[in-house]
A protein has these predicted regions:
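N-terminal signal peptide c-region/cleavage motif recognized by signal peptidases
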Residues: 16-18
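Catalytic and substrate-binding regions of cell-wall glycan-acting enzymes that process beta-1,4-linked
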Residues: 111-156
Length: 156
């Protein structure tokens, strides 16, 4: 689900990490992702025990955000806080921002919110392997991307 992001993506995210959040509909995207991933349940455990919390973080994705936060001099939290709704939401915002920056670099344009979710769900490399195309996504990811695009007024 949440594949490892390269160190290059982390470096890109260090440069104005929060800029993307202000240019898009981040609060709405966060709400949609939490609804899709866990029905807004901070105690959720999925993916055979590998995904935790409202945003269904895997340990490696959580660690990527912790590493970024440490480099930025920000508080990094233990993986057990994936079940803390406030902490997990902050981590999800950072992680979606990392993904957005990575997709921007790879796609040569700012990604749509549904594309960010597709990369969140499939991994950035997994989404790249699918040619960044909606039509190539698995049906369950297509349904979620359609929900996000519709809610945020985006085209697929």
């Amino acid at each position: 689900m949440h594949k490892t992001i390269t160190k290059t993506a982390l470096v890109l995210a260090l440069v104005s990490c929060k800029a993307w959040a202000y240019e898009t509909k981040m609060p709405a995207l966060l709400d949609l992702v939490a609804g899709i991933e866990s029905s807004h349940n901070p105690q959720a455990i999925g993916d055979s025990g590998l995904a935790h919390g409202e945003f269904q973080f895997h340990r490696d994705a959580w660690q990527q955000v912790s590493d970024l936060r440490a480099k930025q001099g920000r508080v990094a939290y233990p993986y057990s806080d994936a079940h803390n709704a406030v902490v997990a939401r902050g981590y999800a915002e950072d992680y979606l921002t990392i993904i957005a920056k990575s997709l921007t670099a790879k796609m040569g344009r700012k990604p749509k919110a549904w594309e960010i979710y597709a990369a969140f769900n499939r991994g950035v490399g997994g989404f790249k392997a699918l040619g960044y195309r909606f039509d190539n996504l698995p049906s369950h990811t297509k349904r979620s991307c359609t929900k996000i695009a519709t809610a945020l007024g985006e085209t697929l």
